[in-house]
Amino acid sequence: MKITPVKALTDNYIWMIQHGNHAVCVDPSEPSPVLEFLVRNRLMLAQTWVTHPHPDHEGGAAALWRGYMESPVYGESDIEAATHTVTAGTQFTFGDGQVTVWATPGHTDRHTSYLLETSDGIHVFCGDTLFSAGCGRVFTGTIEQLYDSFQRFNRLPENTLFYPAHEYTAANLDFAAHIEPDNADIQTALKAAAHTPTLPVTLAHERRVNPFLRVDLPHVRDRAEALSGKTLNSSLDTFVALRELKNQYRTK
């Protein structure tokens, strides 16, 4: 199985998953990059997966379905183009992989992640929940939901690969360095992010550089307290403070 990012809009990635001469597209913000990829690689669209109902994630799903009516569109009931409604725990297959739907709200009150389990491990298509070195903004969800989604991700095996839908890594690492200026892993990742695409990322990597997965560490909590001016009594408090600080932060 081969997984390829296809650039779309300004900073979106539409993830294309190939097995034989069939493909899945994840979060098609627009149809043309997907169609071009399919034609160039002589592939048939087998499935479309949508994580949440924002135009830059579902905008191309209806047009793709009209072109490939035999290919299902998976998404929750608020995804207008969905032909196959999913909920937490829904399972289906693609190629030799098993797909399990997780509810990972926070960015939106209903947000789906798709866990694809293959012989080489777990691949998580996480939309706007987790970004490399960061997390999604809270729109219609709650910060508590987002924290719970991160806690759940953090229980996966460390070699799990995450496939966010945006390339925000450099800006997120800049903020991470603001929180942990002495973290050598963040400095190394910053240098790498300046020269090459950064996705996908392993959970092991994110545990080293993503402040939102490091809220249990005393020095991260202390730094968040110092910058926010608030007393933080729990990991959730630290997560909330970091998200508020990130909202206000301007990349250098």
From Swiss-Prot:
Class of the enzyme per the UniProt entry, highest EC level: hydrolase
SUPFAM superfamilies in alphabetical order: Metallo-hydrolase/oxidoreductase
Zinc listed as a keyword: yes
Pathway(s) it belongs to: Secondary metabolite metabolism; methylglyoxal degradation; (R)-lactate from methylglyoxal: step 2/2
List of residues binding Zn(2+) 2: D56, H57, D128, H166
Pfam families referenced in this protein's UniProt entry, alphabetically: HAGH_C, Lactamase_B
EC numbers on record: 3.1.2.6
Cofactor(s) needed by this chain: Zn(2+)
Cross-referenced CDD domains: hydroxyacylglutathione_hydrolase_MBL-fold
Superkingdom of the organism of origin: Bacteria
Disulphide connectivity of cysteines: none
Binding site for Zn(2+) 1: H52, H54, H107, D128
NCBIfam families, alphabetized: GSH_gloB
Protein family per UniProt: Belongs to the metallo-beta-lactamase superfamily. Glyoxalase II family.
One Gene Ontology biological process: methylglyoxal catabolic process to D-lactate via S-lactoyl-glutathione
Cofactor note: Binds 2 Zn(2+) ions per subunit.
Protein name: Hydroxyacylglutathione hydrolase
